């Protein structure tokens, strides 16, 4: 995993006919990881979408993470899965997907949840929401200092929740290795998505000491 933009899809913003082209736009702009998050569609459609996204992400040499569904991740040979607190256990997901899989864990605003996720083998720790979010308006609010404290786990730290180009810099400075962005990236046409992704990459290039230009951008 590299520091940078973590693009998270949303079926309310991206109808099926736009999903792949929008993700490809984010990848062209420099997204370093993509999460497929779609729970409303029937399983056959989700399977097709996930397979198409795996192909797009593999072409860009960027990991595709499946939200909350280790079985789907295994079926499409995705790079890994992101788990919420009410989803499959880390141990179960690891057993299904193997040691090489990337498994991320939602930690909300809790260092204790992060500690448990770290002990159970999470590959990255996700905190938030940090700002008002239409995607998860009821998620507990997190203070930015939790990003700094979470550095002690020596795992990549991800921030999520209401993130835009106007507020992302402060999260990177506080310790975020990745910014998981939904509406602040995908609410617009493909040209706008690509431009926003490039601007997020610029934030990391300026403010994150370990940022490198993704291979597909060189």
Outline where the language-model segments fall:
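Phosphate-binding beta-alpha-beta segment of Rossmann-like dinucleotide-binding domains, i.e.
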Residues: 127, 134-137
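Internal alpha/beta core interface subdomains
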Residues: 177-178
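Feature marks short, surface-exposed loop/turn motifs that line or immediately flank catalytic pockets
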Residues: 40, 131-134
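Conserved N-terminal beta1-alpha1 strand-loop-helix module at the mouth
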Residues: 1-90, 95-123, 139, 149, ...
């Amino acid at each position: 995993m590299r520091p940078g933009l973590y693009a998270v899809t949303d079926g309310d913003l991206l109808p099926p006919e736009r999903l792949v082209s929008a993700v490809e736009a984010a990848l062209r702009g420099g997204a370093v990881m993509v999460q497929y998050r779609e729970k409303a569609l029937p399983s056959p459609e989700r399977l097709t979408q996930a397979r198409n996204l795996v192909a797009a992400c593999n072409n860009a040499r960027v990991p595709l993470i499946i939200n909350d569904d280790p079985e789907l991740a295994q079926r499409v040979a995705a790079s890994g899965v992101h788990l919420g607190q009410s989803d499959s256990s880390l141990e179960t997901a690891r057993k299904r997907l193997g040691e090489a899989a990337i498994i991320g864990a939602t930690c909300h605003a809790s260092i204790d949840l992060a500690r448990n996720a770290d002990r159970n083998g999470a590959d990255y720790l996700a905190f938030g929401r940090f700002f008002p979010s239409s995607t998860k308006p009821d998620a507990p609010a997190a203070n930015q200092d939790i990003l700094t404290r979470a550095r002690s786990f020596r795992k990549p730290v991800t921030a999520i929740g209401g993130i835009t180009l106007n507020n992302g810099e402060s999260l990177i400075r506080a310790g975020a290795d990745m910014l998981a962005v939904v509406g602040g990236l995908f609410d617009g046409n493909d040209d706008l998505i690509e431009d926003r992704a490039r601007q997020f990459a610029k934030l990391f290039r300026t403010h994150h000491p370990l940022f490198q230009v993704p291979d597909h951008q060189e």
